Structures are given as C-alpha cells and as structure tokens.
Amino acid sequence: MAKFELYAEVDVSISGHQYPIIICRNGLIDPELINRFITSKQVLIVTNRTVAPLYLGHLQSVLPSKQCDVVILEDGEEHKNQRSLFTIYDSLIQNKHHRDTSIIALGGGVIGDMAGFAASTYQRGVRFIQLPTTLLAQVDASVGGKTAINHPAGKNMIGSFYQPQAVIIDLNTLKTLPEREFRAGIAEMIKYALLVGGSFFERIQEALQQGLTVHSPELPLLIAECCQVKAKIVEQDERESGLRALLNLGHTFAHALETYTDYKKWLHGEAVAIGLYCAAVLSEKKGLLDKPIVDQVEKMLIHAGLPHKIPNSIDLIQLRELMSLDKKIKNNCLRFVMIKKPGACYIDDSVTEDCLHNALINVVEGERK
C-alpha cells in the first residue's frame, strides 16, 4: 500500500468544536487516518457518478468492519437540489442509520454541500467528514461549515452552518481532476490572494505566471495557506455576521450568473473568476482601486485560463434583478465586497445603480475601455 504522506495540518476551532484540515497524499486509503474520525459502526458515503468509479472502492476498503452504505448522485451544480437531498435522507432511513452514524462526503463542493446539509438535519445532526476531490472544494468549499442546496430562485438559498469532524485533503485525487475543474479551483485561490495581499498575492501571481498545475511543487503549501486564511476568518465569524462576508468577494456576481444560466454554462469557479473581475472593475469605477491593479487581476485570470468577461448575450437588467435575491442583502441593501488594494477589502452597501451598471457594461465582452 502507498505510504501516507503529510504536508500540513491546519487546526480549526469554532464555537468550542475543534477539527483538523489534513493536507496529504494517500490519506484516502490509509485505514488509521480514516478510522481516526469514523468511530461509529454505521457510515454513509455520499459521492457522485464521476468520483465513485475512481475512489469509492478505495474508501470502502479501509472501512471493512462498518455498515457502509453508499449514495451515488448525479454530477453537477444543477443536481444540488431537494431531490438529491432526499435521496440521501431515504438511504439513511431505509438502512436504519442512527444518531451516532457518520456521513462521508466524497467529491467536490456540490457533494460536500449536500452531504453536509443532510448531516446537519438528519435526526438533528450526525457526524460528518469531508473528503474533497476537487481543487475548489479543497481550498474553499470544504472549509468553514457552510452547507446548502439550491432553489430555483437562487443558489444556496436553503442551508445551514455545520462543522465537520475533519477535512482530509488527499492531493492524489487532483491527478484525475479534469483540467477545466482544476483551473476553476484556481479562481478561489486568486480570491484569497486579493483578500490577503502581501507576499501571498505575489506568490499566487508568480505561480500563475509560471503555469500552476497539479504537479507544481508549490501547490500543497498554497492549498494549506488558503485553508489557513479561511479557517482564521471563520474562527472569528462562523455565521457571516461581519468578517466572513469578505469571503464572498466576487460571489454576488457569480451566483447571479450561475442562476441566469441554470448552472449550465460555467463551473462555479469560472463564474467566480468573472465575479472577481467584476468586483475589481466596480471598485475602480467607485474610485477605490487603481487601474494597474485591475489589469493585474485580469492577467492573473488569463494566466489561469479562466473567463473574466460577461458574454454580451446576457441581459444586464435581468442579471441585476437576480442579484437582488442575494443572501448577503442587509436592510434591503445589496452589499458588495470592494477592493481598495490586495489585502484591503471591505463590505460596501452604498454602491449606486448607476455605478453598478457602469461597471457591468465595462465587463461585457468587447466593451472594456
């Protein structure tokens, strides 16, 4: 059996609940590691049709003494819905899982969100372990305890905050990740670079210029740093009453774009990439951000092979209406994460309709001045 290799361990402490984020190789097939967090006799593995043929058998092999049931869902954001959620509940009930059961999320952010929401609500809460298999889930979606399903009216409209027992990031799973999915995950890394600034921004920028890949030697520690950044923020503000809202940089635009296209045009990270560029242009239009920094953001997204412009086929008025459903609205005011410079972001609820419209026009393909 391949030897377990540890790169980093990030400890998270939220509301008296502590758990580790373990960045490693061969963790998914290490019996000692997996069973350290699965103390129950019952386990439900939630995965999808893409990941199951690759890793399900390996995970099952390290749980030979457990009642190990499996739910295999359809792959994709469009399936993050009530129907999929109830498929998980049905399996738990039909297989007589008790309150001491454990749910394992084996997959990307969609699987983690749904399995986590099921864990937070089944019999008022059962143990939950994250095994993220996409870069986006490893650096962002699996960290911090947000769980949700989508509603036809908008993304992540029904959800909860629920922390896992552990997040085990096995970097070997990235070897089978499609190139497009890997690049989508880089968008969240760029987001962290903008939030943190300083040397981390420079390292991400340099890594992208050199061509960041699954095999880049700096990747494990960059992933660990992203996890550390998010963990530190979430520890201070678990339920997004203030500081944590900064993690939504670019997401007001991204969620509206995803809803507009029924989750069929872009991966989540690709929509975030467009959202980051929108946020940078909006910050420039409000007189906060210098244009050379906007150009830097654009170059980073281009180096990452990510989209950054809004297609001219999209109705900006309808897109603005979808933004009005955003969960971050407070006191009926739409709030944006604005950028003064890398490392200096803040929440702004005073963006005028004219300023927003002007920014959006300048982000449409072929329209940037």
From Swiss-Prot:
Cofactor binding: number and manner: Binds 1 divalent metal cation per subunit. Can use either Co(2+) or Zn(2+).
Principal location listed in the UniProt entry:
cytoplasm
Instruction: Name the CDD domains for this protein.
Output: DHQS (cd08195)
Q: Where does the record say this protein resides? A: Cytoplasm
Database matches in InterPro entries? Dehydroquinate_synthase, DHQ_synth_AroB, DHQ_synth_fam, DHQS/DOIS_N, DHQS_C
**What are the binding positions for NAD(+) in this chain?**
75-80, 109-113, 133-134, 146, 155, 173-176
Full protein name: 3-dehydroquinate synthase
Source organism: Legionella pneumophila subsp. pneumophila (strain Philadelphia 1 / ATCC 33152 / DSM 7513)
Query: Gene symbol?
Result: aroB
